[in-house]
Amino acid sequence: MRYITAGESHGPQLTTIIEGVPAGLPLVADDINEELARRQKGYGRGRRMQIETDQVQIVSGVRHGETLGSPIALVVENRDFAHWTKIMGAEPLTEQEEKEMKRKVTKPRPGHADLNGAIKYGHRDMRNVLERSSARETTVRVAAGAVAKKVLAELGIAVAGHVIEIGGVQAKETTYRSIEELKSITEASPVRCLDEEAGNQMIKAIDDAKSNGDSIGGIVEVIVEGMPIGVGSYVHYDRKLDAKLAAAMMSINAFKGVEIGIGFEAAHRPGSEVHDEIVWNEEHGYTRRTNNAGGLEGGMTTGMPIVVRGVMKPIPTLYKPLQSVDIDTKEPFTASIERSDSCAVPAASVVAEAVVAWELATAVIEQFGLDRMDLIRENIERHNEYARGF
């Protein structure tokens, strides 16, 4: 599977075209809208979420609630575009209109793509950069991820994300009986945290940051259960599944680090306390006593739950702006303020789910793929039976 997105933050709409989704996948707009609504929730979101109520329109590739195997086009309208029609319109402006335009951006914000992008593409108005580099684009990435999650769910593979740290407040390791219970607890938490006490402290940390005109980041974790053994490859560097997952997580706006399983903790332990011992039983076949590897070894799945974490830096748009330089005058200035969140870590956990689901669905279809969901399901069942008796 592959997809491409298009659209600007304050343009008329966001669009994604998805290719390679097998025929026969049950899919309706509500499957996607549910994920879009989850992305818009979370303590610390800004006023933009009060303006936009994201709803998807399925333009092609689905008929009567089932995918056709042809490209799927999804569109999400930007309701705020009504206030930006002149500024973000596609038609040329007159010289007078250009002079009157009040939203020209010449002061790059530290931590954003503004200055680097303006230099790269030669834009004197950095709105041309910030409109596309905005995290608003993750709306349609979540839409694409919703399709991927649907593919995985039909194959018995479940994906769930949650927040384990915000602003230095760390959640205690919390046990849960099933991934469905994990989902239930996190959906009830304003910060999508399993640890209620830590969640309340996270809320206070967000409030403190907001009152100071500042922002805070954190860490999200994505857990996936039900992946067959051996998905991915050890043969070439670019086919290793852990590498693809790491790249996907790092592609999320403001993410600055990724770890799989115990990750960087492995540097502090001897090998005997890192590697997962292999066991076999008649019911499940091969499994592991522990899951320090996070479900991935040698670029392939082990059959254990996949565990991926991502670090999100504080959002760089601040109401207490940092110093910058005006690219027209070269004079120092405090950076311009765009409407923003004080903390987007809870929402980022939903985006992380989406990108992880996409990579896993793509890998599953590549390995077991045909053009029909029923045949892919049969292939996985045969593979699992083979692996148990290997």
UniProtKB/Swiss-Prot annotation:
NADP(+) binds at R39, R45. This is Chorismate synthase 1. Signal peptide: none annotated. One of its GO terms (molecular function) is FMN binding. It comes from Bacillus cereus (strain ATCC 10987 / NRS 248). One of its GO terms (cellular component) is cytosol. FMN binds at R132, S133, S134, N253, A254, G298, K313, P314, I315, P316, T317, R339. Residues 95-117 are annotated as: Disordered. Its cofactor is FMNH2. NCBIfam families: aroC, PRK05382.1.
